[in-house]
Amino acid sequence: MLFRSTSVESIACYLIGITSLILFVIFENKMKDEAILPLRLFKDKTFSLIAVVGVITGAGMFGGLAMLPLYLQIVGGSSPTNAGLELLPLTLGIMTGSIISGRVISKTGKYKIFPVIGTILLTATLFLMTTFNADTKYWWIAILSYLFGVGLGHVLQPTVIAVQNAVAKRDLGVATSSVTLFRQLGATVGTAAFISVLFGRVGNETQAAFQNSVTNPEYQKALMDPNNVSTVQQLQALQTGQATFDDTSWLASANRTLIHPILEGFANSMSHVFLIGA
């Protein structure tokens, strides 16, 4: 179930989150060195910087990661299994980035440049993903997925190394796990925000795409085809508000010409999300 960002349910979640954060800080401060996350670690500039970078990159990269399989399934028409297989270039990119950064760091001992390179690459790739539309070819998606993975590979491990070199030996465990914590916090917030933006825009984007399709002869021909009755009924239900985009499974078997405005609406909305992520 989806709620508007200004709904009572959403505001209640905001308040609960803020209250929980305040209570967490209070109790962690009281526990001193026995705290799960000792607040004294934030006095170290490197640790504080990595914490901020972790939240920001976590939001961007995991928000982007959440969009790719959605794009492949909704716009590309792939099954969940095929969408997972089509993301293999992303995994290969992560492996490549991790291996390259790892080998260079082991030989030179220098690691600070890799998070910078990785962040730049992630930003550039997310920006290029704004070119995705309803007719984007898979080879372009695969290339950008690979580059996105390379960027991730340059960020994930070097940031851990940076923190480990900045803190005292007794804090290695908590500092290392904190990197993952900040990244996951960013991922949680980023994914929720990006999904909200996506479904907040998709209605207007789809409506605009339908209006542009009215004069398309192929669309009108498909609209009058008796074989497309079920698709037409589903489209009418969407336009009258009797159906929502919560369930898009019917798109896989629908006439591609008729649902092209929906695919275009989703693609345009996702492009906006990628731009925010960049």
Spans of model-derived segments:
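Generic low-complexity, intrinsically disordered sequence content enriched
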Residues: V25, P69, G76, T176, ...
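A composition/secondary-structure signal for short, hydrophobic, low-basic-content segments
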Residues: G153, V160, T180, V229-S230, ...
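Hydrophobic alpha-helical segments of secondary membrane carriers
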Residues: V53, S178-F182
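Transmembrane core module of solute transporters
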Residues: T6-V174, G190
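Hydrophobic transmembrane architecture of multi-pass small-molecule transporters
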Residues: Q184-G277
